[in-house]
Amino acid sequence: MEEFQVYLELDRFRQHDFLYPLIFREYIYALAHDHSLNINNRSGLLENVSSANKYKYSSVIVKRFIFRMYQQNHLIISANDSNQKQFFGHNNNLYYEMISAVFAVIAEIPFSLRLVSSLKGKGPAKSHNLQSIHSIFPFLEDTFSHLNYVLDVLIPYPIHLETLVQTLRYWIKDTSSLHLLRFCLYEYCNWNWKSLITQKKSILNPRLFLFLYNSHVCEYESIFFFLRNQSSHLRSTSFGVLLERILFYGKIEHLIKVFVNDFQDILWLVKDPFMHYIRYQGKSILASKDTPLLMNKWKYYFVSLWQCHFYVWSQSRRVRIKQLSKDYLDFLGYFSSLRFNPLVVRSQMLENSFLIDNAIKKFDTKIPIIPMIGSLAKARFCNALGHPISKPAWADSADSDIIDRFVRICRNLSHYYSGSSKKKNLYRIKYILRLSCVKTLARKHKSTVRTFLKRVGSGFLEEFFTEEEEVLSLIFPRAYSASRKLYRGHIWYLDIICINDLVNHE
């Protein structure tokens, strides 16, 4: 962000909290377009073509578009006439794409500046390690063995567009930018809020709506974190008055004053050091060592907060209480639970010896094979029963491109599921992808699988599907046996910043 500070003229705009003038800068559109391309190439998606690739716009189109934005009458276009009207040979969806992409870049500027200023004076921050999704699991391994219950929360999405705009009012003081955002949302877009959470293809600009959704979630989390720090055990009698005050004041800064000054006597201040909160996308988990009664109170609090403060109707089944020793937790593409490992210790005192049976809790992660087969079947790599099939959509590509696609998917899944305690399901997924690749190549050459393998050899694909065990043997050449033992355990990588579509099965 510092290298673009002068280029974006942020100092002059930040003095008055004005972001709206940046919409009329040509280089902002170039930055937004380049960022969309980088995200699409880095995510490793299967067949999802981002909107940045759909609409190729040049600098000439950007200049004409900015010129027409100065003319307010030409900017206002009815959504009902979007199919009939054309803009210099392009569909009006290009308008929506350009505005949404630019606003996503501009809206993130205040938060990026806050992050840069907060990191000053703290030394070099290794943020690339903290960005990895796998960095969560070592934390879960260390903490979950001491916890009992988990609240599995499915965060509801806002039912009205104005809710998202009102949330940004607390952080962005530029009224013109908020009016432009409201104008685009109401006039141009018919958004499916469920697709907002699952990132379906129907979203015109996922980055913008993920930013809006995260802003909405951040507001409710700010209230939750304050209450969690002030009081972990809320009495049931305080919920009614508490939510009335939340509804009355509305803003978080007013909430803090009210809670500290007026409600200190009715909050039961009992700290719970074993409470942990984790969120990713539209799901969050609240793990604690509390009793089922207290976990039910937190469940009631979540539902009441969404309904009374955010006007979101949330059913109680969206918040489920799970016991770690009995139930599996579906989070980040893994089935996680606590497994008891029996341990027998022989103790001898003088002439007497006796055995001591101990049960050690161990954090266990498994691959959800049934949802994974469903994702592979949806992507047409296999049928509903898990039998591999050919990929007709890729049969027209070159052999090297077909193999490269399958290899990339296979390695990404193997890389992500390296933390599984049992690799049997991972081998099954690799088998499906490997045989699907062979069937796709055989379909292209109009032959059977057996005939194709006889012609190219049975070891044709072995060099492309490098096992993680072979990679570890290259890293630890002097301790190959130790690397094999390491491979059987959990391996968490610190370079995974996004989830493949196949893993994100919903």
UniProtKB/Swiss-Prot annotation:
Q: Which GO terms describe its biological process?
A: mRNA processing; RNA splicing; tRNA processing
What's one GO MF term for it? RNA binding
Subcellular location field: Plastid, Chloroplast
Which coarse location class applies to the principal site listed for this UniProt protein? plastid
Give one Pfam family: Intron_maturas2
Write the record's keywords in alphabetical order, separated by commas. Chloroplast, mRNA processing, Plastid, RNA-binding, tRNA processing
* Record function comment: Usually encoded in the trnK tRNA gene intron. Probably assists in splicing its own and other chloroplast group II introns.
Q: Which PANTHER family match?
A: MATURASE K
Give the record's family classification: Belongs to the intron maturase 2 family. MatK subfamily.
Q: What is the designated name of this protein?
A: Maturase K
Protein's organism = Carica papaya (Papaya)
